[in-house]
Structure formats: C-alpha cells, structure tokens
Amino acid sequence: MATAAEQWVLVEMVQALYEAPAYHLILEGILILWIIRLLFSKTYKLQERSDLTVKEKEELIEEWQPEPLVPPISKDHPALNYNIVSGPPSHNIVVNGKKCVNFASFNFLGLLDNPRVKAAALASLKKYGVGTCGPRGFYGTFDVHLDLEDRLAKFMKTEEAIIYSYGFATIASAIPAYSKRGDIVFVDRAACFAIQKGLQASRSDIKLFKHNDMTDLERLLKEQEMEDQKNPRKARVTRRFIVAEGLYMNTGTICPLPELVKLKYKYKARIFLEESLSFGVLGEHGRGVTEHFGISIDDIDLISANMENSLASIGGFCCGRSFVIDHQRLSGQGYCFSASLPPLLAAAAMEALNIMEENPGIFSVLKEKCKRIHKALQGISGLKVVGESLSPAFHLQLKDSTGSREKDVKLLQEIVNHCMDRSIALTQARYLEKEEKCLPPPSIRVVVTVEQTDEELERAAHTIKEVAQAVLL
C-alpha cells in the first residue's frame, strides 16, 4: 500500500515538473547550482604576495615613529598642580595646610558637617554596614531606600520618587529611559555635562536652542510642527521633549519656567527639569524652581536632582507621576545596573530632609547671602559676574578675553591662587573641553552657603576685587 502511494507521489512530482513554466525551472536550477557552489567553494582567496627583502624591512623600521605612551602634558596642567584638602570641605577648609573660608564646595545649606546628619549616618552604618553589594532589582533594596523615596515624593508633592546611587547618573539615565532613536529633544545650549551624556545615550534627534531664549525655542518647535504636518504618520510615533535646568550649572541663571510650560502645552511636548542646583535653594520650602514660580508640579513631566548639593549626601533622585517613575525601575541604566545607594548615605539624606522641613527659614537666609555677595562683587576691574543674584553658585568671567583660552585659564588661576593665600578658597569651573557640546568660557566659580557670615562675604568680595585689580591691570 505504501509503495503504491510513493509511486503516485512520484508521478505527481514528474507531472508538476512538466507543467511548470520554463522561467520557474531555470530559476530553481540557478538556485541549486548556487547552493552547491557555496557548499564546496572556499570562503577566502589566497592572495599572492612577495616577501619583503631585508633592505625593505630595515627601511620600514627606520621610518617607523612610535606614538608616545602618554600624550605630552603642560607643566601647568591641573592634574600636576593639585591641592591637598585635609578634613571635610565644610564652612572652613584646610587646603595645603592653610585654613580658608570655603567658597568652592557645593554645600549650600551647610549640612555637610552637621552633627545630626553625621549621627544618622553612623547609626545606619552600625545597623546595615557599609554597602548593599547589589543593584535595587536584585538584593540591593533596603527599607531605608524605600523610606527615602517616600519622603522625597511627599516633600516634592509628587506621586512617586526613585533614587540613584550617583548624582551624575540620575539625569544621564533618566533621559535615555524615555527618549529613544527617532524622538526629538529640544535642549538649552548651556545644559550641563550630565544632560549632554544622557542625550548622547538616547540617540535621539537633538535640537539646541539659545540659552534661555524662548523665541528661539519656539522657532524650533514651529519648524518641527511643519515637518510633522508633512508626515503625520511619523509624527504620531515621534515624541518631543524639552530639557532644561532649574538653575544652570554653567551660567548660574534661572530657566524661564512659565514660558516653557506655555510652549509645552502649545506644541505638545514633555518637560524634563534638572534641579540639582535649584533643589534645596529656590522656593519658600526649597522645592525648587516650580515652587519659586508657583508652577504646579503636575505641569512638569519629570524632575531630577542630585542629593550632593543641599542634602549633604551622595546620589540623586527623580520624581513625578507613578507610571513615569515605574518605567525607570526597568529602563534606568544607573538604577538597574549599579549597586544601590549605601544605606548610611540614604539615612544622611533623610536627616538633611528633616532639617529642611523643620527650618524653612534657612532658604530665605541663603537667598539674602547670595544677593549680598552678588551685589558686593559688582564693578570688579576686568571681571564680570555671570549668574542670578539668587543663585548660590555663579561665575566670574574675564570682561575681555586675551584671545587664548589657555592664557585666560592661567590668569583666572592666578587670581584663585592669590585668594587662597589670603584664606579665601575658590576654584575654577573645570570642563572636559573635547567632550563639551558648547564649551563655556573660562571662569571662577563662587559658591555661597548659609554658614558664611556677612563679614566673611564682605571680606571675600574685597579680596577678589583687590587680587583681580593686581593681576589684570
């Protein structure tokens, strides 16, 4: 029975072969021959080449110039001329054995050496040990992490918060968690380096607008709107983001948030706000630029900030709606693939948050001190103040550049060194010059804290004026 069936199938195959069109048979024949060729042919060809003579080898060796193992570095490079700090960089700092008033460290609320913060960290150290030895998604989640996230969400009046173990990685992870290839991000040209790295990792289409220029931003949004009208199918799947800083690290200026929110709703974009400098600084209760302008937190899609400037700790956090934050727990690279924040640092941040809530007057004190030194530094010979009067971190730039960045840096460093000799600790703003998208001009960064007395602020301003006049004139 089986033999008869097999014969019938064979007859059908032969009949189908006769009935098939000629081009079909030719195509199948070519494919069969090509498969046979691929199976039996070599995957490479041996190319004939002649060996070099001894003389030719010697000539090549003579001509070869090896690259230096280490690139040439100037003797003035900061890496070769470093300062040694002894003790915590709090109100007073010991640099190279000399005690100075600290105008260089980001310790806005003066909590870095606070006894309560240190006691909370020590108690956590005794309870949990030093590290967690794992990322949050595995065995690196401790109850203190969940408590801190809950406290931050309540403080910022958002649905949920997420903490990262490294401040720089917070916004650098949050941006690529949402913005992907094909999406469009409108970003200020003065954006900090962490934002730049996040944009680079996202592989999105980046459109830069002039610093705090809402007219230029609207121009770019209109151009994109016109492009979307040409291809509505693509526009439906293209997301648009606006990325800004509350207080800009590179300029000390505040973002025009009310105008940004208007443009967001007009052109259907999402706002990501980086508040590392404005959190714990702006607003009646230190909630940042949204509280400063009276903008509803719901108008901002994502807020990011580090805990290294005001909370006297390490790491960072993002806050917003629950569905926005939950997405980061699966897509935030710095959250998924990094060991979680050491519990002692989470406990320190929580205690700092307690102090902020118990003493809201600290923010008005900081604001007054910022205004005081900002006013005192006006009219310096050869230098100009760059930044808002309410910013605790602002810049002193040369009014007239020498035309050489290297020479400008040397002049400013000379001012810093002379101020250090007179017990005022300052620092230049440093950048990875080859990596920066829009490299800011050289500057001296001045940082104000609540611990600095009025007398120290006046003395610092007077010292900077005298030194600048001696160096630049």
List each model region and its residues:
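Substrate-binding/gating loop at the entrance of the active-site cleft, primarily
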Residues: 166, 187-203
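Conserved PLP-binding catalytic core of the aspartate aminotransferase-like
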Residues: 74-76, 81-84, 111, 362-374, ...
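N-terminal "arm"/small-domain region of PLP-dependent enzymes with the aminotransferase-like
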Residues: 4-5, 9-130, 269
